[in-house]
């Protein structure tokens, strides 16, 4: 993973203010706009869908707003900036429609207005901007017009994302996710509640043909640590460093962790449920990790082995789940094979990698000739957020597949959708005739979501065949 500051919110993209015609970060806006209804889940429209949107405008002033306003609907896109994977440039494209609308809003009052569009033919991202003249311009929403995917149930889809909500994943045709969960002790008072919530979520995944790689993390174990606190590294004087902390639980909890993993595999493992693989920790680097790993490779091997034992026991009861991880081939060699033996190979079904590009470990004879469960070690990209623009994501996916990846990711979800359940506001307050009411927030979907939909339709589950331009691109 990377520091949150590296990922850029849409309002920080190059050209956002100019293309949208809005001003970011003002202390006061005369009016606000909220999308309160959309005729497509996650604001992703397919060719057969009617495009209908309903907005609520709120007057933030003590004066009436009575104006002939304009609703601008226009197509835009994003493109990459050389040597920068995190900062997109927004560009305006060839469609724009202006809808006149008269708005009359009482002081500190509100009004609802609907917008319908029936002449969009090109795939991509579309912005809806309200222009109220002297009262300013505000973004109403961003939606995408995307290719409709052909979804079928499968165990190992070739494209994956992090969890962005079932609606969004379904609409862009992505059927596999990395899903991080904490280790919750089976003896804790909230374990059954945790299981029930997970059961609801896993059913949602299963019903929508979305497979899951569970990534077990640090859990809720601070109270079990010495002095009941997590542990950062020390400097040469024995003082705590202001850095990441060690969140690894103590060895006496390993058997409970094994029980935890086994119960989840039995409950939610394939084919009974959507879980097709498990791994341990996000980027568990040696020394320190953004995700709180500061134990040594011996400790990792101990915990990983318990996770693998749980999976093997679940397999004996008909569950088909892979076990793997590492997040880079060099880290996997450290964690699993540093003793010079292949003793861990039978419980190393897949390697997860992050940000390795063409440096794909597909030529290791020991991994390719593996005869244990499901054969050779699979190569899964479970992060690599590098193709974060319309013009890059398809190329990144194609390049990764050509490098021998069995699964690609290639993009951070926030560049496609602002509704990540773990990073976004769930509810908003709207005005009604009966007073204020909380409703689910409808989030903006950005142009790169349409590029992902196109990649899924045009690349999808196809096997890599050959490089067309073996001596480099012809231009």
Where are the model-predicted features located?
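Mature N-terminal, pre-catalytic/accessory segment of carbohydrate-active enzymes
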Residues: 1-174, 182
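N-terminal substrate-binding region of glycoside hydrolase catalytic domains
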Residues: 137-263, 275, 279
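Structural preference for beta-strand elements that scaffold enzyme active sites
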Residues: 158-160, 176-178, 209-213, 275-279, ...
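Acidic-and-aromatic substrate-binding clefts and catalytic sites of carbohydrate-active enzymes
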Residues: 160-167, 181-197, 221-224, 285-288, ...
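Sec-exported extracytoplasmic/periplasmic mature domains
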Residues: 170, 182, 206-210, 266-270, ...
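Active-site cleft segment of glycoside hydrolase catalytic domains centered on the general acid/base Glu
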Residues: 227-350, 354-371, 390-398
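Substrate-binding surface in catalytic domains of secreted glycosidases
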Residues: 355-397, 405, 414-423, 438, ...
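Aromatic- and carboxylate-lined catalytic core of secreted/periplasmic carbohydrate-active enzymes
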Residues: 398-475
């Amino acid at each position: 993973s990377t520091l949150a500051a590296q990922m850029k919110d849409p309002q920080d993209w190059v050209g956002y203010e100019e293309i949208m015609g809005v001003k970011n970060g003002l202390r006061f806006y005369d009016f606000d706009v909220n999308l309160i209804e959309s005729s497509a889940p996650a604001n992703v429209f397919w060719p057969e869908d009617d495009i209908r949107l309903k907005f609520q405008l709120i007057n933030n002033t003590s004066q009436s707003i009575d104006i002939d306003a304009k609703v601008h609907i226009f197509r835009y896109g994003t493109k990459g900036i050389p040597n920068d994977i995190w900062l997109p440039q927004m560009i305006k494209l060839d469609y724009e429609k202006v809808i006149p609308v008269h708005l009359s809003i009482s002081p500190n009052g509100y009004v609802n207005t609907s917008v319908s569009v029936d002449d969009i033919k090109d795939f991509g991202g579309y912005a809806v901007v309200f222009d109220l003249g002297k009262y300013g311009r505000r973004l109403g929403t961003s939606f995408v017009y995307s290719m409709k995917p052909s979804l079928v149930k499968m165990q190992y889809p070739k494209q994956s994302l992090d969890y962005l909500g079932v609606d969004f994943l379904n609409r862009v045709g992505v059927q596999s996710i990395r899903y991080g969960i904490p280790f919750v002790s089976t003896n804790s008072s909230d374990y059954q509640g945790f299981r029930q919530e997970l059961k609801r979520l896993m059913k949602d995944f299963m019903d929508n043909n979305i497979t899951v790689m569970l990534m077990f993390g640090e859990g809720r174990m601070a109270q079990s640590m010495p002095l009941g606190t997590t542990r950062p590294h020390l400097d040469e004087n024995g003082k705590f460093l202001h850095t990441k902390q060690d969140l690894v639980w103590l060895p006496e909890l390993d058997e409970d962790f094994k029980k935890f993993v086994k119960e989840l595999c039995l409950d939610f493992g394939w084919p009974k449920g959507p879980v097709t693989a498990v791994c341990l920790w996000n980027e568990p680097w040696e020394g320190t990790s953004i995700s709180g790993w500061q134990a040594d490779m011996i400790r990792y091997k101990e915990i990983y082995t318990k996770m693998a034992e749980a999976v093997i026991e679940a397999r004996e009861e008909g569950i088909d789940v892979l076990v793997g991880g590492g997040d880079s081939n060099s880290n996997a060699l450290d964690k699993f094979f540093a003793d010079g033996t292949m003793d861990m190979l039978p419980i190393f079904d897949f390697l997860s990698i992050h940000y390795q590009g063409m440096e794909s470990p597909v030529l290791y004879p020991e991994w390719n000739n593996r005869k244990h469960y499901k054969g050779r070690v699979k190569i899964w990209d479970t992060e690599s957020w590098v193709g974060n623009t319309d013009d890059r994501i398809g190329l990144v996916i194609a390049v990764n597949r050509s490098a021998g990846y069995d699964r690609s990711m290639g993009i951070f979800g926030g560049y496609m959708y602002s509704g990540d359940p773990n990073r976004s506001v769930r509810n908003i307050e709207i005005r009604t005739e009966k007073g204020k009411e909380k409703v689910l927030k409808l989030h903006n979907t950005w142009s790169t979501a349409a590029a992902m939909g196109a990649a899924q339709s045009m690349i999808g589950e196809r096997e890599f065949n050959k490089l067309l331009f073996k001596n480099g691109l012809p231009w």
